[in-house]
Amino acid sequence: MSKKQSSTPHDALFKLFLRQPDTARDFLAFHLPAPIHALCDMKTLKLESSSFIDDDLRESYSDVLWSVKTEQGPGYIYCLIEHQSTSNKLIAFRMMRYAIAAMQNHLDAGYKTLPMVVPLLFYHGIESPYPYSLCWLDCFADPKLARQLYASAFPLIDVTVMPDDEIMQHRRMALLELIQKHIRQRDLMGLVEQMACLLSSGYANDRQIKGLFNYILQTGDAVRFNDFIDGVAERSPKHKESLMTIAERLRQEGEQSKALHIAKIMLESGVPLADIMRFTGLSEEELAAASQ
């Protein structure tokens, strides 16, 4: 398929006809699936811009996009009429990309639900009949598996309803799942035993452990953070030293962050530099960085 299809005489003639409302109504009357056509209020037929389409996608298409309101209640149906003078094995996928872009554009306009976008392919190439499937799922190497995945709800990992005992069996994912399930609890002390058990399993590296406790400090119950990390450390002899080091470093980083925040406010308020240094304990270099 030519990269610049819209410059061909085939495309020019196609658009000359299909961008006329009366011609489009007749086209849709004959070619739009009857159950969908019955839902359309053809008096509301409106030619839509395709400026929302990515440049790389737009250059691959010669398309006309019409919208109509539905006969029953508020709602829109978009009719994507694509022109091809040569066959393309992946055209169904490309039309699906266009359809999804049209749906996103509809949401960006303020609507709260997805519209129906009906792709229709107008073809008059040399190969006859059209040699490829127009079901985008057939574009996959394993169409059967694609149907199983994309014709049903996507897999959901909802830790909010997952029993803790089940989470504890999830090896390297267990720490993440357990903490993010319970992070909004007012008191995390009830997780001390489980946390210590998971740390003792050796599934998390030092970087992950530091990130985990930093997350708890920032997002969880900061007031009892010291008690929490001390409790975990006492039950994890192997990690006790590193946990206490992490805890102290996080406390220092937290204090440093607070001091920098206060210093920035004081700088913006015009407080003399010497007074800020005395009040916050920050150096002149640290204050210079805070002012950036």
Curated annotation (Swiss-Prot):
GO terms for molecular function: double-stranded DNA endonuclease activity; endodeoxyribonuclease activity, producing 5'-phosphomonoesters. The keyword Phosphoprotein does not apply. Optimum pH is 9.0, active between pH 7.5 and 10.5. It is an enzyme of class 3 (hydrolase). Disruption phenotype: Cells grow to slightly higher density than wild-type in sublethal levels of streptomycin. A quadruple rpnA-rpnB-rpnC-rpnD deletion shows no change in basal RecA-independent recombination. Endonuclease activity partially supported by Mn(2+). It comes from the Bacteria. Pfam families: Transposase_31 (PF04754). Changing residue 84 to K: No longer increases recombination efficiency, toxicity or SOS response. GO terms for biological process: DNA recombination. Keywords: DNA recombination, Endonuclease, Hydrolase, Magnesium, Nuclease. Inhibited by EDTA, Zn(2+) and by Mg(2+) plus Mn(2+); stimulated by Ca(2+) in the presence of Mg(2+). Its EC number is 3.1.21.-. Its cofactor is Mg(2+). Changing residue 94 to A: No longer increases recombination efficiency or SOS response, more toxic than wild-type. A low activity DNA endonuclease yielding 3'-hydroxyl ends, equally active on ss or dsDNA, not active on dsRNA. Shows no sequence specificity. Upon expression enhances RecA-independent DNA recombination 49-fold, concomitantly reducing viability by 88% and probably inducing DNA damage as measured by induction of the SOS repair response in RecA cells. Belongs to the Rpn/YhgA-like nuclease family. This is Recombination-promoting nuclease RpnA. It comes from Escherichia coli (strain K12).
